[in-house]
Curated annotation (Swiss-Prot):
GO CC term (a single one): cytoplasm
Subunit-structure text: Heptamer of 7 subunits arranged in a ring. Interacts with the chaperonin GroEL.
Taxonomic source organism: Yersinia enterocolitica serotype O:8 / biotype 1B (strain NCTC 13174 / 8081)
Function of the protein: Together with the chaperonin GroEL, plays an essential role in assisting protein folding. The GroEL-GroES system forms a nano-cage that allows encapsulation of the non-native substrate proteins and provides a physical environment optimized to promote and accelerate protein folding. GroES binds to the apical surface of the GroEL ring, thereby capping the opening of the GroEL channel.
Localization per Swiss-Prot or TrEMBL: Cytoplasm
Name used for this protein in its record: Co-chaperonin GroES
HAMAP family: CH10
Record SUPFAM superfamilies: GroES-like
Highest taxon in the source lineage: Bacteria
GO biological process: chaperone cofactor-dependent protein refolding
Length: 97
C-alpha cells in the first residue's frame, strides 16, 4: 500500500534507538526508550498560507530528522510497519552528515 500525506504532513519511519548506555550497559524494554529520530518516507505538497499560496516543505524524502514525539504525532501500521504521521512543525531538526 502507498500512502501520500496531505498538505504539510510528513510520514516518518522511526529509527531504532541505541540499546547500550554511554557506559556500555545493554538497555532493554522501556529503559531503552523510543527514538525521536527517523527517516522521512513521504511528504505532502506544502503548507497552505493565509493568502492561499502553497509553501513547499523544507524536509524531503530520505532526510533523517529529529522530531517532537508529542500530541500531534499519529502512529499507524502500513504494510506491517509502524510509521508516524506528523506535521512539518513537529520536526525539530534535519540531521546532516
Amino acid at each position: 500500500m502507498k500512502i501520500r500525506p496531505l498538505h504539510d504532513r510528513v510520514i516518518v519511519k522511526r529509527k531504532e534507538v541505541e540499546s547500550k548506555s554511554a557506559g556500555g550497559i545493554v538497555l532493554t524494554g522501556t529503559a531503552a526508550g523510543k527514538s525521536t529520530r527517523g527517516e522521512v518516507l513521504a511528504v505532502g505538497n506544502g503548507r497552505i498560507l493565509d493568502n492561499g499560496e502553497i509553501k513547499p516543505l523544507d524536509v524531503k524524502v530520505g532526510d533523517i530528522v529529529i522530531f517532537n514525539d508529542g500530541y500531534g504525532v499519529k502512529s499507524e501500521k502500513i504494510d506491517h510497519e509502524e510509521v508516524l504521521i506528523m506535521s512539518e512543525s513537529d520536526i525539530l531538526a534535519i540531521v546532516e552528515a
